[in-house]
A protein has these predicted regions:
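Conserved catalytic core of the tyrosine transesterase superfamily
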Residues: 1-319
Length: 319
């Protein structure tokens, strides 16, 4: 997408900030959308000098009526980063506090071994009259979600140029935290991607997405969610609804739990396993990985028994 035009007193600084973020390896897309909203906000408030008061900050940070929690989190915290940038340049701006998610009792669905087997049997035998390419795409796409723990948007954002077939490495650009990262494929996934490339890559250019719709466009998450529901039904895995899943995103949770368990079982210390998992998942800090450790310990009590004290030492509090 092209960069929007900024018109507030912050316009030049916003453009310089976006250039700086891109040079640092971040994706411009989500920053530019939020900063365009911020630019419009500042224009409407009549801010005519590069300053940002506490009153301005309070107005910006207020949660909107129809705003999702995740959108509110991104809107406030990304503008806070921009304000920190201005502060370092010597401008008089009020620095907002971070917005945090409220604690929740929600528990993601961790797929059992039997559910995983049934699910992928249904995926591998899926047939579509609407788009025959789906029969080729879906076994690869869904296995990336489970075997690599990628988010759906990250997966649909993979382009041909992002795939290193020789070394089995995929670069993820459209990430939640707007910072590129790499995922390393195991031998099975590497072979699967190579077979997929043999069937499809000759049809697309380097800048094209590897998962295209029948219209030749980037696939939409909504369609993949609908297929996921159909696969659950065929695999006889009950769908609870109302956000209780099993959701597409629960494949990421399942990957994280299984990966942490595998590392622990192989003798890797928790102090070593945590940063490995955190980096692979694209988390900013190991604290974002805490929920997966809790999930693993609740599902496998022997791990809790072995590491409960270390968990307390790292995160504080108790299980």
């Amino acid at each position: 997408m092209s960069r929007p035009a900024f018109h507030s007193v912050f316009a030049d600084e916003i453009n310089q900030y976006l250039d700086y973020k891109i040079a640092s390896g971040f994706s411009e897309k989500s920053f530019s959308i939020i900063l365009k909203s911020f630019d419009d906000f500042c224009s409407k408030r009549g801010i005519d000098s590069i300053s940002f008061t506490r009153s301005d900050a309070d107005a910006w940070a207020e949660k909107r009526k129809t705003e999702a929690t995740t959108s509110h989190y991104a809107r406030v915290n990304k503008v806070k980063k921009f304000l920190e940038y201005l502060n370092l340049k010597g401008y008089n701006v009020y620095l907002m506090h971070d917005v945090f998610f409220k604690a929740t009792d929600f528990q993601p669905h961790i797929y059992t071994d039997d559910e995983i087997l049934r699910y992928f049997q249904a995926v591998d035998t899926y047939h579509s009259e609407r788009n025959r390419m789906e029969e080729v795409q879906l076994p690869v796409l869904f296995r990336l979600l489970y075997c690599c723990g990628t988010r759906i948007n990250e997966t649909l954002g993979i382009k041909k140029s992002d795939v290193d077939l020789e070394n089995g490495i995929i670069k993820l650009i459209e990430t939640k935290n707007d910072c590129e990262r790499y995922i390393v494929l195991n031998d099975g996934m590497k072979h699967l991607i190579q077979r997929y490339a043999d069937k499809t890559f000759y049809l697309i250019g380097d800048s094209d997405y590897i998962f295209l719709s029948h219209a030749g466009e980037r696939r939409r998450g909504r369609r993949i969610y609908d297929i996921h529901r159909m696969i659950l039904k065929r695999a006889e895995i009950p769908f609870l609804g109302d956000g209780n899943g099993p959701r597409l995103h629960d494949w990421r949770h399942t990957f994280a739990v299984h990966s942490f368990k595998q590392m622990v079982d192989s003798g890797i210390d928790m102090y070593v396993a945590l940063p490995i998992l955190s980096t692979y998942l694209g988390h900013k800090t190991i604290y974002a990985t805490e929920r997966y450790v809790r999930l693993t310990m609740s599902l496998y009590p022997y791990i809790e028994k072995r590491f409960s004290q270390r968990f307390t030492d790292i995160f504080g509090g108790s299980l």
